């Protein structure tokens, strides 16, 4: 007898070995039809995903996985990647297959082919995929030896797949999945048949180096998306359209904020307007430092390699570090700021009475990211972090973490982000420090979130070897998630670099070090801001807060006077004194997403007033200049958004 325990605790008895599909069928025809895989666990072991054809020989716990489960959606996407490869091989037999993983919201598959795939090719491939899905071919799992698999794939000319398999230890049994005439290496599991794959779309083709190495052949990567329902896919495609409209690279060009060029890959050329936006963000964060007990510091850009070896960065991060040599010494361009802050801490001997000691820096970092991964301001090689480090005692951990989370929530709200997701990454199997101190650190992080009213997820084992962390993820205006802030407990670096304080018993002890950032990379955060607001920045952030437009040359001098008056008040304002029609001026400045347009003609000049238009169709009519000044000052002090006011009007 085999006893199967279901998620609701109920148990079912079977006279002998039973497959996942048979269990689903015994529960109901609807579940059997919806079943994509099973999640099975034996004798209290960790559950694992298996095919519906998986045979259960012993008592087990089993959950039937359907398209409603996150695992089910991943199965659909991974199986659709194989369906893509099947279709490509059907249409282009000379193409060679390589790898095809699941990614966020979809999948990709890399191919080697003698010519680039065209948009017409993608249409034909997608049509072929739909045809193969309609055939509802059974997907079966086969086990091969490594050498058998290498010989097979070499024999059919699949040299890339043979190379992948040859790198697997010879004593491992491999799983291959077959659907129709196509067979591919895969750990699985897969959907039981191609007919389960109903909703998918190929998105684009791009270049990708074999094994991610620029010295290797350039392959063609076909991206696709797959979903459990057409409604889900339609919502995703709509979000993509909106994301394209909001793309910070496009808006950056249109609003003359910044640009990129080939001579500086992964680096940004900031234009005056863009740098004005940057300055507002940095100055805001500088005040955050000042108001919350941080001392701003500045550490060197390059440090001798011996220091990076002491911290462990060289062993674990060297591929991402830029180096330079001078006078027979090798230096590393800093990829992060923490070692420099420890050196500043070590410059003097500190008493426990001085702790917590909080350092903050707008630290410029450089990381040698692969060229293929660079993406506007979201993934760069040179960036600035609002990086801070807190040196404290174990007893101060919880208060410091709670204060940081409360501060982070306020900062995000000020920038227009009100939805934050919280995740606590706990101790990994390989770690340093006693269980007692890990208990204290993890408890401090979780309790700090509870104290600030946060619901959070726990990611077991995802902490660093030197301490647990909290990750803070923002949700933007179109529902995308961006991981920005973090606070991480570090028991290791203070010890490695000899950081000490004198405790109340006159004993020297290493402090606990908290790595913390709210915005993360300022470049990336500004890119997020641009996309979240679709370029229409609230007045407190806008590079230009207002433009004063004269209707004719008669009112040009009055427009110039108003502009100067506003500038003296500290506002960022320009005058448009051109002899163009006022309708053209209004259109041009509206496209530049200026929060306020002040229009002045003979009537306004005679009465000492201004006609005020706000972004998003807000019309304040004709008002006194002092009233506008008061309004703009309130917008800035409250960080109010003009477009939100317009939509509420």
UniProtKB/Swiss-Prot annotation:
**BP terms from Gene Ontology:** threonyl-tRNA aminoacylation
Tell me the segments the record calls region Catalytic.
247-538
According to UniProt, the name of this protein is Threonine--tRNA ligase
| Function per UniProt | Catalyzes the attachment of threonine to tRNA(Thr) in a two-step reaction: L-threonine is first activated by ATP to form Thr-AMP and then transferred to the acceptor end of tRNA(Thr). Also edits incorrectly charged L-seryl-tRNA(Thr).
Q: Could you say which protein family the record assigns here?
A: Belongs to the class-II aminoacyl-tRNA synthetase family.
Describe the subunit structure: Homodimer.
What gene name is given for the protein in this entry?
A: thrS
Highest taxon above the source species: Bacteria
Domain TGS as annotated: residue spans: 1-66
Per the entry, which co-factors are needed?
Answer: Zn(2+)
């Amino acid at each position: 007898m085999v006893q199967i325990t279901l998620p609701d605790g109920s148990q079912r008895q079977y006279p002998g070995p039973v497959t996942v599909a048979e269990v689903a069928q015994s529960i109901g025809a609807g579940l059997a039809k919806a079943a994509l895989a099973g999640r099975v666990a034996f004798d209290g072991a960790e559950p694992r995903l298996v095919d519906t054809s998986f045979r259960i020989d012993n008592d087990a716990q089993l959950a039937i996985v359907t398209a409603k489960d996150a695992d089910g959606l991943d199965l659909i996407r991974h199986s659709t990647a194989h369906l893509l490869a099947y279709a490509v091989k059907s249409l282009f037999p000379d193409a060679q297959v390589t790898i095809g993983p699941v990614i966020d919201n979809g999948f990709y598959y890399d191919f080697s082919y003698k010519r680039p795939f065209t948009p017409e090719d993608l249409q034909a491939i997608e049509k072929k995929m739909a045809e193969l899905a309609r055939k509802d071919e059974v997907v079966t799992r086969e086990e091969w030896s490594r050498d058998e698999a290498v010989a097979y794939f070499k024999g059919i000319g699949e040299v890339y797949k043979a190379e992948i398999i040859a790198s697997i230890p010879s004593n491992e049994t491999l799983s291959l999945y077959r659907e129709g005439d196509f067979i591919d290496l895969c750990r699985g599991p897969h959907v039981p048949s191609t007919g389960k794959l109903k909703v998918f779309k190929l998105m684009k083709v791009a270049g990708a180096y074999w094994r991610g190495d620029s010295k290797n052949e350039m392959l063609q990567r076909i991206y696709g998306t797959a979903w459990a329902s057409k409604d889900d896919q339609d919502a995703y495609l709509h979000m993509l359209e909106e994301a394209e409209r909001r793309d910070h690279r496009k808006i950056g060009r249109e609003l003359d904020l910044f640009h990129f060029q080939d001579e500086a890959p992964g680096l940004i050329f900031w234009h005056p307007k863009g740098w004005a936006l940057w300055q507002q963000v940095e100055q805001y964060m500088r005040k955050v430092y000042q108001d919350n007990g941080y001392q701003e510091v500045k550490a060197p850009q390059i440090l001798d390699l011996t220091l990076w070896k002491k911290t462990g960065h060289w062993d674990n991060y060297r591929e991402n570090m830029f180096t330079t040599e001078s006078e027979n010494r090798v230096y590393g361009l800093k990829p992060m700021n923490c070692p420099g802050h420890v050196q500043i801490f070590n410059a003097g001997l500190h008493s426990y009475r001085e702790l917590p000691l909080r350092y903050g820096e707008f630290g410029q970092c450089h990381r040698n990211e692969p060229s293929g991964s660079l993406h506007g301001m979201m993934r760069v090689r040179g960036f600035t972090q609002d990086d801070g480090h807190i040196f404290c005692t174990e007893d101060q951990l919880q208060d410091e973490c709670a204060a940081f989370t409360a501060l982070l929530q306020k900062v995000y709200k000020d920038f227009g982000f009100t939805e934050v997701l919280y995740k606590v990454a706990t101790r990994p199997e390989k770690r340093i420090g006693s269980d007692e101190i890990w208990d204290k650190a993890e408890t401090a992080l979780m309790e700090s979130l509870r104290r600030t009213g946060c619901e959070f997820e726990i990611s077991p084992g995802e902490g660093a070897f030197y301490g647990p962390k909290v990750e803070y993820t923002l949700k933007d205006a179109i529902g995308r998630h961006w991981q920005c802030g973090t606070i991480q407990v570090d028991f290791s670096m203070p010890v490695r670099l000899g950081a000490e304080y004198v405790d109340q018993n006159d004993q020297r002890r290493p402090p606990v070090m908290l790595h913390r950032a709210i915005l993360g990379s300022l470049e990336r955060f500004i890119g997020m801001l641009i996309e979240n607001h679709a370029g229409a920045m609230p007045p407190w952030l806008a590079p230009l807060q207002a433009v004063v437009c004269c209707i004719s040359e008669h009112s040009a001098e009055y427009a110039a006077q108003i502009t100067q008056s506003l500038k003296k008040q500290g506002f960022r304002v320009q005058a448009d004194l051109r002899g163009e029609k006022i309708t053209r001026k209004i259109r041009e400045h509206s496209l530049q997403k200026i929060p306020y347009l002040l229009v002045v003609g003979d009537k306004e000049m005679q009465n000492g007033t201004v006609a005020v238009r706000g972004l998003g169709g807000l019309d304040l009519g004709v008002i006194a200049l002092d009233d506008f000044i008061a309004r703009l000052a309130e917008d800035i002090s409250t960080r109010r958004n003009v477009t939100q006011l317009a939509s509420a009007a």
